[in-house]
Amino acid sequence: MATYAVLGATGNCGTALIDNLLRTEGAQIHAFCRNKPKLMQKMPALVDHKRVQIYEGSIDDIDLLAECIRGTRAIFHVVTTNDNVPGCQVGLDTAQSIIAALESLQALEPEGTKPPKIVLLSSGTIDDHLSRHMPSFFRRILRAAASHVYEDLRRTEAFLRAQPDGVSTIFIKPGGLSIDVQRGHALNLDRDESFVSYLDLAAAMIEAADDPDDRFDGKNVSVANTNGAARFPMGTPLCILTGLARHSFPWLHRYLPATGPG
């Protein structure tokens, strides 16, 4: 069975990916995180789990990252932040480390070995086509409220699209996300939808990565609900307000609370 690398394993999407993969028969998981105790606290079932290998360290540790992604089918790049952090570039830094790790592995692998595909968690809000149904004034508000994060995503996407043909990336661009139960999903190339649970998002990412015909490689892919929308995240208003403050007054960042979808 296939092996998958999850980068950003302690986040909402990372834990949802691990949850889904644990329910996939035979799937092996390489979870990369900065803080193993935090991951164990969030997911106690991972302690001594035979199908899970945890890699604890910095994303700048190319040797450790190469060990994590070696022999995998897909690399789920879900390293990001819910807060509009000025100067944010965690997405780009992670993507650059992934490419450096892949290049180091290429020198060790037999010629013709197919590298794992990258599945990047991005956002439908920055995609004019997927989010065209959203009122323009509200889209401007959302783009400002996460301006620093979205700029990081744009730069990350541009970097990955500039890679040689042998490196394939799927760009997952959901609408609003919520911590909620799994209801059922469908991959959608035409529009995003709000709200989608992290569990449904994760299932969609795995489906796209596993597509036998590679139909989603290089494409912007969103996620639709098939059995009702996820609940409204109560933390959204505060997240938007503090994001707008960080956009207009970046120096306020250190004084503002950390937020999340909730």
From Swiss-Prot:
Pfam families: NAD_binding_10. Disruption phenotype: Leads to total loss of monodictyphenone and agnestin biosynthesis and accumulates emodin but only traces of chrysophanol. The lineage of its organism: Eukaryota, Fungi, Dikarya, Ascomycota, Pezizomycotina. Belongs to the avfA family. Oxidoreductase; part of the gene cluster that mediates the biosynthesis of agnestins, dihydroxy-xanthone metabolites. The pathway begins with the assembly and cyclization of atrochrysone thioester by the non-reducing polyketide synthase Agnpks1. The atrochrysone carboxyl ACP thioesterase AgnL7 then breaks the thioester bond and releases the atrochrysone carboxylic acid as the first enzyme-free intermediate. Its EC number is 1.-.-.-. Keywords: Monooxygenase, Oxidoreductase. Pathway: Secondary metabolite biosynthesis. GO terms for molecular function: monooxygenase activity. This is Oxidoreductase AgnL4. InterPro entries: NAD(P)-bd_dom (IPR016040), NAD(P)-bd_dom_sf (IPR036291). The keyword Oxidoreductase applies.
